[in-house]
Regions:
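N-terminal accessory segments that target, anchor, or regulate ATP-driven/P-loop NTPase machines
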Residues: 1-50, 409-412
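Short, structured interface segments
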Residues: 32-44, 298-311
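Active-site phosphate-binding and catalytic loops of NTP-dependent enzymes
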Residues: 85-92, 203-208, 315-321, 344-350, ...
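Active-site alpha-helix of zinc metalloproteases
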Residues: 99, 165, 323-328, 336
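Short pre-active-site segment immediately N-terminal to the catalytic Zn-binding motif
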Residues: 313-328, 370
Length: 499
């Protein structure tokens, strides 16, 4: 309001002076220069107030609304009990909890956990991103940290609450190790102010503040931020396992009409490596596909199509040439043959429908969730990755760039084998291993597996030719139909129609 009054008074004054015959040009030039200086000097940024994002719906989110993170939820609830029952904690001489750090990959529900924590303690909730605090002008970040804590206290008092929760996403942006940003002390000043504010949190305050940070790079954080008395709890929020994925799918499909044939357990098995955000997107995409098809329920085909879309992206509008499609079909059948030899029944779908950056792909039914890999498992994975290019070479006497992503992944796995002591170099130190020795070890591993795959597929050239011809005609082959064709059974199965 004061801004509008000032502008009105200035305009009225200028009109009055103009009527009195005063030359206004010098005043206009001076005003323009002052405005330009104000914007370029950073004064505008310094004077601009900072406001965190207040979430009125935070109190509506509970831990029961979050699936797939049972261990993380249990650890957070245990920590929050010190705040809920602060009097009992004080009697035992327990230091008040000031900060909780949630560490884990993107999309695993760290923000939801923070909101549920606020609801659990009956606290006001305010959120900010680490990138909002750092500017090119010195002092801005520290000023915004002070404003954030002040806003949290005022918000709690406004709603007659004794607790406030501040959530800082991507906290590694402002909490990175000091001294790494040469020539830019703004980062260090911002972090110092955050440390000061957290040290100033007292159990005797009218409003008790809990700071919850989220990051996927704990290794980048300054040690001072992680010491006891600041972030007292570091809780890992990992990708959900199969049971966790099933819980998340049940939550996100609770408001959607599912066809009786939809098996959520099967979908959970096929989505190894999916985060909670991926699974929410999967359920939403399946509903969109059902809507487009005019269906009243979500069918298995909608979920199959949605899995492909989440993993690989939208279908491409541009259609490859017939020559390219033949090569893609041979490439994918090469993958499929080796996959079926390694683990019979592993192929779910093979298709030459372009999607995302892939001209075709083979989707497997994942094994049980595993977090350790043996040498044999890694070698078999290398064989599967190499098989597409070898199939192309056997039928077309040349390779294509379509295998480049396979080779990148194969090289990564071969390096993993070297660093795990699975090469002829034995146990090595990854940091001191010369690059030329690493390159030779990786090359030997890949050459050995390539020779094994070539020997295997040379005896299956006719199978590749026959099955790829069927794939060209149908564009998609379900795993059961593929296995019939490999076995030489040409009796057609009932087609599996994917949305």
């Amino acid at each position: 309001m004061s801004k509008e009054i000032t502008i009105g008074v200035a305009i009225a004054t200028m009109i009055f002076l103009a009527l009195q015959g005063v030359n206004l040009l010098p005043f206009l030039l001076l005003g323009a220069l002052s405005y330009l200086f104000y914007n370029l000097s950073g004064l505008k940024v310094l004077n601009k107030g900072f406001q965190g994002q207040v979430s009125p719906r935070a109190r509506e989110i509970t831990f029961a609304d979050i699936g797939g993170q049972e261990k993380a939820k249990q650890e957070i609830i245990e920590a929050l009990e010190f705040i809920k029952d602060s009097s009992a904690a004080e009697q035992l001489g327990i230091r008040p909890l000031k900060g909780i750090l949630l560490a884990g990959p993107p999309g695993t529900g760290k923000t939801l956990l923070a909101k549920a924590a606020a609801a659990y303690t009956g606290a006001s909730f305010i959120a900010a991103a680490g990138s909002e605090f750092v500017e090119m002008y010195a002092g801005v970040g520290a000023q915004r940290i002070r404003a954030l804590f002040k806003q949290a206290r005022e918000l709690a008092k406004q709603h007659n609450r004794k607790n406030a929760t501040i959530f800082i996403d991507e906290i590694d942006v402002l909490g990175g190790k000091r001294g790494q940003h040469s020539g830019h002390l703004e980062y260090d000043q911002t972090l110092n102010q955050l440390l000061v504010e957290m040290d100033g949190i007292s159990p005797n305050d009218d409003v008790r503040i809990l700071v919850i940070g989220a990051t996927n790079r704990v290794d980048l954080l300054d040690e001072a931020l992680l010491r006891p008395g600041r972030f007292d709890r570091i809780i890992q929020v990992e990708l959900p396992d199969r049971e966790g994925r099933l819980q998340i799918l049940k939550i996100h499909t609770a408001n959607k009409p599912l066809d009786p044939e939809v098996n959520l357990e099967s979908i959970a098995s096929q989505t190894f490596g999916f985060s909670g955000a991926h699974l929410e997107s999967l359920a939403n995409e399946a509903a969109i596909l059902a809507f487009r098809a005019g269906e009243k329920t979500l069918k298995p085909g909608h979920f199959n199509e949605a899995i492909d879309k989440v993993m690989l992206g939208e279908k491409m509008d541009r259609q490859p040439s017939e020559k390219e499609l033949k090569r893609v079909a041979v490439h994918e059948i090469g993958h499929a043959l080796v996959s079926e030899r390694i683990r019979p029944g592993s192929v779910s779908i093979v298709t030459i429908v372009p999607r995302g950056s892939a001209l075709g792909y083979m989707r497997e039914v994942p094994e049980d969730d595993s977090y350790l890999q043996t040498r044999r498992q890694l070698e078999e994975r290398l064989q599967l990755l190499i098989a597409g290019a070898i199939a192309e070479e056997l039928l077309f006497h040349s390779r294509s760039t379509g295998a480049s992503s396979d080779f990148i992944e194969a090289a990564r796995l071969a390096k993993k084998m070297v660093f795990a002591g699975m090469s002829d170099l034995g146990i090595v130190d990854p940091e001191s291993l010369p690059r030329h020795l690493l390159h030779r070890a990786v090359a030997r591993i890949l050459q050995t597996q390539e020779a094994l795959v070539r020997k295997e597929l040379q005896d299956k050239v006719e199978i590749i030719r026959r099955v790829s011809k069927e794939l060209l005609q149908e564009e998609k082959l379900a795993g059961e139909r593929l296995r019939q064709l490999i076995a030489g059974e040409d009796k057609p199965l009932e087609r599996v129609h994917l949305a």
